[in-house]
Amino acid sequence: MGSYIPSTGEERQAMLQAIGLTSTDQLFDVVPESVRVKSLDLPEGLSELEVGQKMAELAAKNRVFPSVFRGAGAYRHYIPSIVKTVTSKEEFLTAYTPYQAEISQGVLQSIFEYQTQMCELTGMDVSNASVYDGAVAAAEAVFMCQERKRSAVVVSGAADPQTIAVIKTYCESREVPVIVVPADGCATDPAAIQAALDGATAAVYVQSPNYYGVLEDMDAIVAATHAAGAKVIMGVNPISLGLLKTPGEYGVDIAVGEGQPLGMPLSFGGPYLGFMTCKKAMMRKLPGRIVGETKDDDGNRCFVMTLQAREQHIRREKASSNICSNEALCAMTASVYLAAMGPKGLRQAAESSAAHAHYLAGELAKLGFGLCSGDKPFFHEFLTDSPKIGRASCRERV
């Protein structure tokens, strides 16, 4: 019997005889007759040609929109063909990461390279091997900032509503106070953030570009937060970092975001990638896996899972988080994308996205659709008001 060829009828009969049975049905005698499925009443199978025709018939009922402009956290960018070619190789596309991870040096090296690239991209010191998505990354970052006398988190109301909802869900079980500061128009007011800070505040979460596409005043927000003794978590679009200042340049403590724009298709919502990078001082609070570089007994360069005392297979329920191995493939997808694009390619993608968005905003303005954000700077998406609806109503509906 070949690796992927099912057993023949003769082979199945021989196996039944070996255990003293005459039919496959006898294997299920222990299942009560009343709950057994008598028949599925399925039609005859179709040929390959007939299946293709049936699928074409169903697809013809769809309304296809080649251009997707929805944005709001998931973006359709150009993906070099080499990304799928590399990530589809059987050496990487496996069912599971071995428990003895060090035998998979290729996988560990790909994770290490991903971590290195994310640190360079965000300007931070340390990266983990990723988490499930950007919202989870934000919620995990909140827990990283928890201290004995500081637990509350202040969240910008201009952040992605789904991210805010996930943060609230995570914090509810631990009774962590979540204070949402309403957006001032389409942006965050640094003075409002400052007013919400007190001695119990552990962290402030701000997204820039925010949900409305506006670039926040991160310098003022970081200064106010650090002056109050709290930490800053910045949610960021990774494509924007090809053009804009990095979280590290702003002086934030933790940078998180949705990694889907880095080579992952929309795929009806997943699987996506949550990236997390932080300052070295917070490294031991970083959730998920971290791969480090070392040398073996012969002095050869090799890679290992490091700082494992934080993880679930050692600390169990006290672990900082629980992350599955599927994320390694998504992380490698981002790594291959960044390698294929290079610094110039990433900057070109960012500049092209920003230029097209600003061109569209200008053309819509000629038709009477103004920007809800007024003259505030934005990156590659924006919210318009409608001449018939009004600016406030547009924001409310979004």
Model region roles, listed by residue range:
Residues 1-39:
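Compact, charge-rich alpha-helical regulatory domains located at protein termini
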Residues 2-5, 17, 41-45, 101-104, ...:
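Hydrophobic alpha-helical scaffolding
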Residues 15, 136-304, 368-369, 391:
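Conserved PLP-enzyme active-site core in the AAT-like
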Residues 33, 37-113, 314:
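N-terminal entrance/gating region of PLP-dependent enzymes' catalytic architecture
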Residues 89-101, 117-123, 149-150, 171-179, ...:
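Gly-rich Lys/Arg/Thr-decorated short loops/hinges at beta-loop-alpha junctions or inter-strand turns
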Residues 99-103, 119-139:
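Short loop-beta-helix segment that forms the pyridoxal 5′-phosphate
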Residues 262-367, 371-375, 379:
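Active-site C-terminal subdomain of aminotransferase-like
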Residues 369-395:
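Conserved PLP-binding catalytic core of the aspartate aminotransferase-like
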